[in-house]
Amino acid sequence: MGWNLHQMDVKTAFLNGVVEEEVYMEQPEGFVIHDRESHVCKLKKALYGLKQAPRAWYSRIDSYLTDLGFSETTAKDNLYYKVVDCRPLILVLYVDDLFLTGDEEMIVRCKRELAREFEMKDLGLMHYFLGLEVWQGPNETFLGSIPDQQDRDGTRDEDDD
């Protein structure tokens, strides 16, 4: 098929999530209102570290992907697909990283649509992910572990383990 793997990163992904229940927090240090030190802030958006943040982000991106015509597979969460004119597009969501493969024209269009809704960084073709190096050729893709620095410069002794 010759499908390439593309990678995008959603900047400040959790801040895109909307908190559906009432959540309050103390005023942040440095932003305390004089004479109202005991007041708290009601959150409208998710913050990093908030236990509801991953769920709020996932709900937000899931809704948007559905609006774009994606369907989530029943076999695996965070794996989406869509087919337009017999041209497939597959999207994998991993926290704040998106991976796309399929028809190149559809990938380009999808990247534009995602960037309109979320602040994104297009990382282009995937080269690294979760400690794996990804090599992509015209009709093949290889995964391999990334050697640590000692392995690369030949200083690691097998007996050190």
Q: What positions do the PLM features span?
A:
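Long, low-complexity, charge-biased intrinsically disordered regions
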Residues: M1-D161
